[in-house]
Regions:
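Conserved active-site alpha-helix within GNAT-family acetyltransferase domains
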Residues: 61-67, 71-95
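Hydrophobic adenine-recognition pocket in adenosine-nucleotide-binding enzymes
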Residues: 36-38, 73
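Conserved acetyl-CoA pyrophosphate-binding loop and the N-cap/start of the following alpha-helix
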Residues: 42, 46-51
Length: 95
């Protein structure tokens, strides 16, 4: 999973992993944020937003950042600057 990622960023509290983001990108047009996970005990402290900010810092302003949200996180992303896309299609995975 991580071996094929272009960008992996982690957040730690001492020796405890509390957050991780994983992205795939061409570094010129788009970056797909495939995973964003923060330990429930550490949510609502800006960790997810910081993981995204660091991803954006790596890809730069000229690269679009896109993602597929988990249903429970749909309300989160607009709060941190994402816009709902009305021009996207998906072929869902079979498993």
């Amino acid at each position: 999973m991580f071996a094929n990622a272009d960008i992996v960023i982690s957040a730690w509290d001492g020796a405890r992993l509390v957050g991780v983001s994983r992205a795939l990108t061409d570094y010129s047009y788009c970056c797909y944020l495939s995973d964003l996970a923060v330990d429930v005990a550490y949510q609502k402290h800006g960790i997810g937003q910081e993981l995204i900010r660091r991803t954006q810092s790596i890809i730069g302003e000229e690269v679009s950042l896109i993602l597929m949200s988990a249903p429970g996180a749909m309300a989160y992303y607009p709060k941190i600057g994402f816009a709902l896309a009305d021009n996207a299609y998906v072929i869902r995975r079979k498993r």
